[in-house]
Amino acid sequence: MEVKFFEGDWIWDEEIYPNVYSCAMVYANGKGFRVFEISDRKNEVHELLDFMRKVKKAGHRLVGFNSVHFDYPLLHHILTKSRKVLKEGKELKITAKELYDVGMKLIKNQYDEDNKFGSAIRDKDVIIKQVDLFLIHHFNNMAKSTSLKMLEVNMRSQNVADLPFPVGKVLTNDEIDILLHYNKHDVKETLKFYYYSYEAIQLRKDLSITFGFDCTNFSDSKIGETLFINRLEQAKTGLCYTQSKHGGRKINQTKRPNGIKIKECLFDYLKFDRPEFKAVHTWFKDQVITETKGVFSDLLEHQIGDVAKYAEMKV
């Protein structure tokens, strides 16, 4: 495979345990590996900050896997706290335990169904530009969700390594050394996937210029959705969103207090011959919903009418 990369990209990954935080990164050409550690035995937070200042000053980017919702918010905590204490003239104190607590909160937020945007930092507040391969390939979609380990298998990696210790374990010095090795391994595998993703990243770079909005971390479908909405808004301002006094915007939604009749959403040309399909079709036409998320999940037998008798049918 021909190796193509963008100048100024750093591939990175973080690991966090109660007594150790590690951040590993390598330049997009595969050279210049760096590993920073914050633990009971070593605290390289100032070295990490010095390096990040150079990355920021050079206009470079950090490329990760699920970094927008985890790795970067954790780094952002370090960067913003550093700025705050510097402004106040105080000494910077950051421990692995502090970062671990932040990390666990970030993970919890990722599984919060009521928190649509998780822990992502607002674009205008991001200090160092991010490229997230996880989002670009739409792996945040439940139907497409894929782990880095699965990608390692698909990329025919010689070594597929999983997290060496259970989450929350207090590590010994020897175990910390193993964790640092694992952290570097994940960065190498992310780098490999970055090479596979070159054309997708280039496309988003070109489209961002063409359409006038940053779609670096957008999936293919989100690019289309955003472009469509922008075109509608250009044709008639306020068609899709209502602007707030504070500069934000709220999506316009049609209120349906009496629910949505599914039969009104089904095309008339839908016809089925098999009895089990007819049963499903008939059942859907009888449904009225007031929510759209999870309403047809975990249904009991008495709730699905004639469909139940076909549930275990072999075809």
PLM segments and residue spans:
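A short acidic-Thr-Gly-centered motif at the start of a beta-strand
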Residues: 1-7, 52-56, 303-315
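Two-metal-ion RNase H-like nuclease active-site motif
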Residues: 6-16, 132, 315
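Generic N-terminal leader segments that precede the first folded domain
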Residues: 7, 24, 28-29, 35
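Short, well-structured alpha-helical interface segments that form or flank functional binding sites
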Residues: 9, 70, 185
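Short N-terminal binding/cap micro-motifs at the start of the first secondary-structure element
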Residues: 18-23
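Short secondary-structure boundary/capping segments
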Residues: 26-28, 77-82, 207-208
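Conserved DEDDh/DEDDy metal-dependent 3′-5′ exonuclease domain
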Residues: 32-150
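Conserved "right-hand" nucleotidyltransferase catalytic core of DNA-directed polymerases
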Residues: 146, 154-162, 168-315
